[in-house]
Amino acid sequence: GLMSSIGKALGGLIVDVLKPKTPAS
């Protein structure tokens, strides 16, 4: 649902912050 989409987006941003070396897919 909408919350899941938001969670995915936030999770992606967090991953970018914690693992900047990981290229965004």
Curated annotation (Swiss-Prot):
Keywords: Amphibian defense peptide, Antibiotic, Antimicrobial, Secreted. Its main location: secreted. Expressed by the skin dorsal glands. One of its GO terms (biological process) is defense response to bacterium. GO terms for cellular component: extracellular region. This is Aurein-5.2. It comes from the Eukaryota. It is found in: Secreted. The keyword Secreted applies.
